[in-house]
Amino acid sequence: DYDKLTAANEIGKIATAKIEIMLEVLNYFVDKLETESEAYSRKLQVNIQYLLDSMLTSRRTVSVSQEFAVRVTDSYNDESKSEGQFAVVSFAYIGGILKMLKDDNNFQGKEYPLVLDGPFSKLDPDQRQNVVNMLPTFAPQVIVFSKDDLHDVISNDNIGRVWTIVSNDEKNIARVEEGKLWK
């Protein structure tokens, strides 16, 4: 048996002591990971629920597992959702993470822009307006790429600069110009 043989000599005793130390270190980190995962998943769940309540036009309940998998259900415990609701849940997940980063001491004072490409295409008008109203709370700078004119949806107070990508379909060449250049 390994324990009897290793206990018989000094080198074996040292090896056994090192193994015990490493097992204690392993247990510490396993416990820390479990505790932190549980705490962060609860915080994320609260953040996502708040954002969903603000952005969705229907009531949904959020649960976040320790592995950060999100489950969103209605009052019948049904998970099915429209493409628009799925998009809003995605926004809420991103927003929930960004809120956690803002609250984390290691990230305070640092600014990260949020870049969204065509984010409103699946949303109905009410959901779109609710999401637009929440976006400025996600990050200090939000960059939105859209093929649609959003001036009727986003207030001028929340628009810094507008750039237009002007493409020439025949030559597949594009240039970027400042300003709203579409009609």
Write out the residue ranges for each language-model feature.
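Conserved catalytic network of the ASCE P-loop NTPase/AAA+ motor domain
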Residues: 81, 104-108, 134-138
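Extended, charged coiled-coil "arm/hinge" scaffolds of SMC/Rad50-like chromosome-maintenance ATPases
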Residues: 1-71, 102-107
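Walker B catalytic motif
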Residues: 111-119
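Hydrophobic, well-ordered secondary-structure elements that form the walls
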Residues: 52, 89, 117, 142
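Conserved ABC ATPase signature
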Residues: 37-41, 70-98, 119-125
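Eukaryotic, compositionally biased intrinsically disordered regions
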Residues: 59, 67-69, 120-123, 133, ...
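C-terminal lobe/lid and adjacent interdomain/linker elements of RecA-like ASCE P-loop ATPase modules
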Residues: 126-183
